[in-house]
Regions:
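Extracellular adhesion/carbohydrate-binding repeat motifs centered on closely spaced tryptophans
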Residues: 1-56
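Generic structural signal for short, solvent-exposed loop/turn connectors between secondary structure elements
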Residues: 12, 27, 33-36, 130-157, ...
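Generic detector of short, well-ordered, non-transmembrane alpha-helical segments enriched
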Residues: 13, 104, 122, 172-176
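Short, charged/polar, Gly/Pro-enriched secondary-structure boundary elements
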Residues: 23-24, 46, 136, 215-219
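Short, well-ordered surface patches within globular domains
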Residues: 55-145, 181, 187-199
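A well-ordered secondary-structure block
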Residues: 141-242
Length: 243
């Protein structure tokens, strides 16, 4: 559970930015000088370092060991360059990916289905898979998840193919190539993750993964997860310096 009301004007709140050429003490007097830090629940994070970590800096706030998902020991590991602007792990690409989950849930709502929660782990898995699939041009099959993939220009909506075109085929009794559509409307799926990579020779690579296996502390409502992400995103890119 995250307290979105914890934005304070001093270091006593859950969230604050303290910067400028000042000494800042926390948790027993550890001090920093001349930089800007994000403070979350008593722990300070250097903003420059967090930007370099891209989405992983955010994912680690929920699960400190999640970076291990990007080091699976497969050759696919090489395709993730954490924090790179065109990588699925860039903060901006993660922000864009969250819109994909919103769109998916709107489509599910039209079928009377429950909203998919966002899994922090599935966000990491989607980023890893999508980075690799930008080169492999196929599913890599490392993780046991349902997956939709698409390649196309940045202005293209992957749901035009995954949902609109495949639903039309399904409704006409053409069932040969409707797997993406069926993933979207599968009522056994309860959680999801989404990613966008900009490295593909065909433009962007879009990837969405699905599962019905929820882990405690890993799954959140869309409102809670997106709200927490945007607090972090805005704090990192538009810090309000206090003090």
């Amino acid at each position: 559970d995250f307290d979105f009301n914890g934005i304070a004007s001093n270091s006593s709140g859950n969230w604050c930015i303290w910067g400028g050429k000042v000494n800042f003490g926390y948790d027993g007097g550890v001090k920093y000088l001349g930089s800007t830090y994000l403070v979350l629940d008593g722990e300070a994070f250097c903003i420059d370092e967090q930007i370099g970590k891209g989405s992983v800096g955010f994912l680690e706030l929920i699960n400190p060991t999640i970076s291990g998902l990007f080091k699976c020991g497969y050759a696919y590991d090489q395709y993730t360059v954490i924090g790179a602007a065109d990588d699925a792990t860039s903060l901006e690409n993660m922000r864009q990916a969250l819109y994909g989950i919103l769109e998916c849930n709107e489509l599910r709502k039209a079928h009377g289905l429950q909203e998919l929660k966002i899994s922090n782990s599935l966000m990491a898995i989607a980023e890893y898979d999508t980075n690799a699939s930008a080169y492999a041009m196929d599913h890599i099959g490392v993780f046991n998840v349902g997956e939709n993939l698409a390649w196309g220009p940045s202005f293209w909506d992957p749901f035009d193919g995954w949902y609109t075109q495949e639903k039309a085929d399904f409704d006409q009794g053409n069932y040969a190539n409707v797997g993406h559509y069926l993933n979207i409307i599968d009522d056994s799926y309860t959680i999801t993750g989404f990613a966008v990579n900009q490295k593909s020779a065909y433009g962007n690579t879009y990837g969405q993964v699905f599962s019905g296996m929820e882990l405690e502390g890993d799954c959140f409502s869309v409102d809670d997860y997106c709200g927490f992400f945007m607090l972090y995103y805005n704090a990192v890119y538009n810090p309000v310096v206090l003090g």
